[in-house]
Design a protein with these regions (language model features):
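Short, acidic, small-residue-rich periplasmic hinge/interaction motif at the N-terminus
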Residues: 29, 40-43, 74-78, 92-140
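Short acidic/polar hinge/loop motifs at secondary-structure boundaries
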Residues: 62, 186-213
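N-terminal periplasmic accessory domains that precede
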Residues: 95-102, 147-150, 165-170, 182, ...
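Outer-membrane beta-barrel translocator/receptor signature
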Residues: 190, 205-207, 218-288, 294-302, ...
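Flexible loop and strand-edge segments within Gram-negative outer membrane beta-barrel domains
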Residues: 281, 293, 313-385, 400-423, ...
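Outer membrane beta-barrel strand-and-loop segments of large Gram-negative receptors
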Residues: 415-429, 574-580, 586, 599-664, ...
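Gram-negative outer-membrane beta-barrel transporters
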Residues: 605-609, 626-724
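C-terminal beta-signal and adjacent terminal beta-strands/loops
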Residues: 609-611, 615, 720-727, 749-813
Length: 813
């Protein structure tokens, strides 16, 4: 596969252009003073190229094909802008034909461009599909411990967490295999069915995150029922630039230290970027339990790309490697409340040791037994090839996820569980010749997966899956209307291999076995999905949106065949081979109002799901928990299905009153309720639905420079997580969670030299400012064993945490 990627890459570079040189040139000024703006970023996502304005506000983008493209224009302190810009032959440009663009001085995000789930770059405000966006600037101002934590505070978004290192996105109450995670528009596949399986993406490499709420995209096939999260890395810098950055950060709670170094450039149509980063964290502390044993992690990552921009289009070969070791807390304590950890007494004897709060500080006990090692490596070749009036987008990728778990204190290097998942993907989209008001595209997605178990134990079988899908998508523009519609067909083929054990638990062939761990089977699933939506721009301030979509999710191997307990979880899971494919029908209604001093977004949805798959706890014949392995007494859960409905919505407002344009008052409210239909009272609520969430933030920013400080800001915010009493209480599957408040604050600025160049960016923040004792309803540690000293169930959320981040821009050329 790697040879194929390289062959295609070098073959494309030999294509010969058949038309003359085209370019894009323009000038950007302040909308009030009409002064030229220096350092404005102009980026065309469909071409993976852009430019930055010079001291006269001018910019030039060379080596582009003929056509009109949607550009995103951004500068800190100004409203971003989506602008359609057209290329012309080099000889056609002069001072009178330059593009004239003005930016409004405000930090509000008015018209960002999105590229996720649509056939081409689209202005977010006009897209009928509900979306959310998080930028690098926002992530720098709001600290988190992992990539998913950076989006969990957005309206309608939550996360399932297991400590500080492991988090999984939840969109409007749905997560796991119902959320497709992308890295630069290509699926990230890493055994995402597991509670303690996080997202293998380096937080430092993220430039922005785009989110689709619901099955509104037909571009990605099975599993996108809840939506899509697309982690986008920085795009190539402007032609002629060479630079980079050095970033570092420290958090006081747990001692998390991270750093990253990046170098990039773009010369003569060849762009490149290389990044290396690392993180190290010890045990974190909570207000009620002090330091929590075995909650540290360490991480070493690398990524980069090399790209080629020519008249025929763009080709980019990217790579990434993610390497993480995570300690898995078990929460066992003695009668005095001290945490217990397993220790090795001699070669044949294991014991336990109680650790005081002082002993748990630092890093010495942060990576004990049990722990995970995760390696995720991927290479992707992305191509955008332009013809005279059409283009072809082709992505080829290969990735491998190695997930190993260690739980034997007498043999700490013994891999009790080892899963190697290899995924190959092909995504192709052909964009037909478009008119001024319409665009048609069609595409195919192919994916092959192979899972191989190499450890002492297996909780899912060895298997192979093959996915194939085809879709067509249409967009129509009118003066005030925007229409979009699409249809898709998918098939998934599954080949699951059997595993048989003899009386000693050793693998045997089918003729000598005494126990069937996994039985062999073959299955296939076929489904159809579609989307239709419209937006209506009543005036320059107000837009209405309506969208109807049908989603599809084939059962995963965990649901069909799991059989075992995972380290870091508190349950034993068994699969169900009779599971059917889930299908859903969702309707979304929304409106957006934007003005110079007030922004408002309101979204509502209703989602009906057939054959909804969920876990439920099993009771034994004696009425208590069913226990599969008395030596490791975890309760047994199994997968069942039923029809379900989810409904709710989000409200977001941003007030920045005149003449206090430097002040922003942001508020948001998110609500979702999930119901299982035709069930008894204790089983009517969908399990593990996030509670209603209210967030409020006041943000003040300096409009002018203060000595050597530029873009200085101060913010303070509060989040209210309401009580979640609507739980799936049957068999003790889920417990209620009380309400709580969390407060945060932050400040920072860019430090400039005498020439006005930014030499250092500084960001301070404080999370859980009041040191509140709380449990997140979606925390898996909530179900850890109770503390014998006070009877409190589970482990609690991180206490007060101060953070500092430093970013040093490097400008070589």
């Amino acid at each position: 596969m790697k040879k194929i990627l390289l062959l295609i890459f070098f073959s494309i570079t030999q294509l010969v252009a058949l038309h003359s040189q085209y370019s894009i040139r323009g000038r950007i000024t302040d909308s009030e003073s009409h002064e030229p703006l220096y350092g404005v970023s102009i980026f065309i996502a469909d071409l993976k190229t852009g430019a930055a304005t010079d001291t006269n506000g001018n910019f030039t983008i060379n080596n582009v094909p003929q056509g009109t493209f949607l550009a995103e224009i951004r500068m800190i302190g100004y409203a971003s802008k989506a602008e359609p810009i057209s290329s012309k032959p080099n000889s056609a440009w002069n001072d009178s034909t330059l593009l004239r663009i003005e930016l409004l001085k405000t930090p509000a995000e008015y018209h960002p461009v999105i590229i996720t789930g649509v056939s081409g770059s689209t202005e977010r405000m006009r897209n009928p599909v509900p979306t959310a966006l998080n930028t690098k600037e926002h992530m720098l101002k709001h600290s988190s411990t992992n990539a998913v934590g950076a989006i969990a505070e957005l309206p309608g978004i939550s996360m399932v967490s297991t400590g500080n290192a492991i988090s999984k996105p939840v969109i409007r109450g749905l997560g796991y295999n119902r959320v497709v995670v992308l890295r630069n528009n290509v699926r990230q596949e890493g055994q995402q069915w597991g509670d303690e399986h996080g997202i293998e993406i380096d937080e430092y490499e993220i430039d922005r995150i785009e989110i689709i709420k619901g099955p509104g995209s037909i571009m990605y096939g099975s599993d996108a029922m809840a939506g899509v999260v697309n982690f986008l890395t920085p795009q190539p810098v402007a032609e002629g630039k060479i630079g980079g950055e050095i970033a570092t950060g420290y958090q006081t709670n747990g001692g998390l230290f991270g750093s990253s170094i990046m170098q990039e450039g773009h010369l003569h149509g060849i762009s490149w970027q290389v990044r290396m980063s690392q993180k190290l964290a010890g045990n974190y502390s909570t207000p009620i339990d002090g330091y929590i044993a075995n909650t540290g992690f360490k991480e070493y990552n690398g990524s980069g790309f090399i790209g080629l921009n020519r008249k025929w289009g763009v080709s980019q070969l990217s790579f990434s490697t993610f390497n993480q070791t995570i300690a898995l807390p078990e929460g066992e304590r003695d009668s005095t409340g001290m945490f217990l950890i397993p220790i090795r007494i001699n070669d044949t004897t294991a014991g336990i040791q109680a650790l005081s709060n002082d002993e748990l500080k630092g890093y010495d006990y942060s990576l004990g037994i049990p722990f995970q090692k995760i390696g995720h490596h991927r290479a992707v070749l992305s191509n955008n090839i332009f013809f005279r009036n059409s283009r072809l987008k082709l992505d080829l990728g290969i990735q491998q996820n190695n997930r190993r778990e260690y739980g034997n204190v007498l043999a700490p290097e013994e891999e009790e569980l080892s899963m190697k998942l290899t995924t190959s993907t092909l995504n192709a989209v052909y964009f037909f010749p478009e008119t001024k008001t319409a665009q048609l595209s069609a595409g195919v997605n192919l994916q092959h997966q192979s899972n191989l178990n190499e450890g002492e134990e297996s909780i899912i079988p060895d298997y192979q899956t093959n996915d194939a899908g085809a879709f067509v998508f249409f967009r129509k523009y009118a003066t005030k209307w925007f229409f979009s519609a699409g249809a898709r067909s998918d098939i998934r083929l599954i080949n699951s291999e059997g595993l048989y054990l003899d009386s000693t638990g050793i693998t045997a062939d089918s003729s000598a076995y005494t126990t069937t761990k996994f039985s062999a089977f073959n299955k296939y699933f076929v489904s159809y999905s579609g989307v239709a939506g419209a937006s209506y721009q009543m005036n320059k301030h107000l837009v209405w949106r309506l969208n109807l979509s049908r989603g599809f999710r084939a059962p995963n191997m965990s649901g069909l065949s799991s059989n075992g307990k995972h380290e870091g979880t508190f349950r034993y899971e068994t699969g169900n081979k009779s599971l059917k494919a889930e299908t859903s029908l969702q309707v979304d209604l929304g409106t957006t109002y934007t003005s110079d001093h007030f922004n408002l977004e309101i979204s509502a949805f209703y989602n009906s799901i057939q054959n909804f798959t969920y876990l439920t706890k099993l009771n034994s014949t004696f009425g208590g928990d069913s226990i599969a392995d008395p030596s490791d007494p975890a309760p047994v859960y199994t997968f069942v299905q039923g029809n379900a409905a989810l409904f709710g919505g989000e409200i977001y407002s941003d007030i920045h009153p005149h003449p206090l344009d430097w002040l922003h008052f942001e508020n948001s409210l998110s609500y979702v309720q999930g119901l299982l239909l035709n069930q008894p009272d204790s089983m009517t609520n969908l399990p593990f639905i996030p509670p209603m969430k209210y967030q409020s933030e006041i943000n003040a920013h300096a409009e002018k420079e203060i000595g050597p400080l530029k873009n200085a800001y101060f913010m303070i915010g509060a989040s209210r997580f309401f009580a979640q009493n609507k739980v799936y209480s049957a068999f003790g599957t889920e417990t209620a969670t009380p309400a709580y408040w969390l407060m945060e604050a932050g400040t920072g600025a860019d430090i400039i030299n005498k020439k006005g160049t930014v030499v250092l960016r500084v960001f301070f923040s404080a999370n859980n400012l009041l040191n509140t004792t709380y449990q997140s309803h979606l925390s898996r540690l909530k179900y850890a064993p109770a503390n014998p000293l006070n009877g409190r169930q589970g482990l609690y959320g991180q206490g007060r945490n101060f953070s500092i981040r430093l970013v040093i821009p490097v400008n070589i050329k």
